[in-house]
UniProtKB/Swiss-Prot annotation:
Superkingdom of origin: Bacteria
GO cellular component: large ribosomal subunit
Protein name according to UniProt: Large ribosomal subunit protein uL10
One Gene Ontology molecular-function label: structural constituent of ribosome
InterPro entries xrefs: Ribosomal_uL10, Ribosomal_uL10-like_sf, Ribosomal_uL10_bac, Ribosomal_uL10_bac_type, Ribosomal_uL10_CS_bac
Summary of the function given for this chain in its UniProt record: Forms part of the ribosomal stalk, playing a central role in the interaction of the ribosome with GTP-bound translation factors.
Gene from which this protein is expressed: rplJ
GO biological process, one term: translation
Presence of the UniProt keyword Disulfide bond in the record: no
Self-association state and partner proteins as the record states: Part of the ribosomal stalk of the 50S ribosomal subunit. The N-terminus interacts with L11 and the large rRNA to form the base of the stalk. The C-terminus forms an elongated spine to which L12 dimers bind in a sequential fashion forming a multimeric L10(L12)X complex.
Length: 166
């Protein structure tokens, strides 16, 4: 079905709004993936706070123009599925990576984070970013570990002083 000019403008505006509020973006090719599997992917994306849409490449180029995702223009060939992470930078990459493991025909093309282009082979960098809660937990563990080490060193120093005095 052909899109009218107004429909195209609406799509560009909608995707541009999503891009402006997004933390990262991932582009993929979903040729050969069944509708049922795509429906499950869309549902999972909504639950993860990821905006996902199949968009014509020319419209997508216009939508990301002037945003930090303009670096993706070179990979916009063939059928394009784009996902913008709104809540966590690695959400879309993690979602696509897990989906690609289960579906051989699903191909991740590239990603972008903070205006930096991320090739498909390096998408793990983005997918393995810790969530906010995970980062806080790691920080707390490091702080707790440091204070426990300090306590052990202090007790050892007191012991050494007592042994030297005796």
């Amino acid at each position: 079905m052909a899109l009218g000019l107004e429909d195209k403008k609406a799509i560009v505006a909608e995707v541009n709004e999503a891009a402006k509020g997004a933390l990262s973006a991932v582009v993929a090719d979903s040729r050969g993936v069944t509708v049922d599997k795509m429906t499950v992917l869309r549902k999972t994306a909504r639950e993860a706070g990821v905006y996902m849409r199949v968009v014509r490449n020319t419209l997508l180029r216009r939508a990301v123009e002037g945003t930090e995702f303009a670096c993706l223009n070179d990979v916009l060939t063939g059928p394009t599925l784009i996902a913008f992470s709104n809540e966590h930078p690695g959400a879309a990459a993690r979602l696509f990576k897990e989906f690609a493991k289960a579906n051989q025909k699903f191909e991740i093309k590239a990603g972008a984070f903070n205006g930096e282009f991320i090739a498909a082979a390096q998408i793990d960098r983005l997918a393995t970013l810790p969530t906010y809660d995970e980062a806080i937990a790691k920080l707390m563990a490091t702080m707790k570990e440091a204070s426990a080490g300090k306590l052990v060193r202090t007790i050892a120093a007191v012991r050494d002083q007592k042994q030297a005095a005796a």
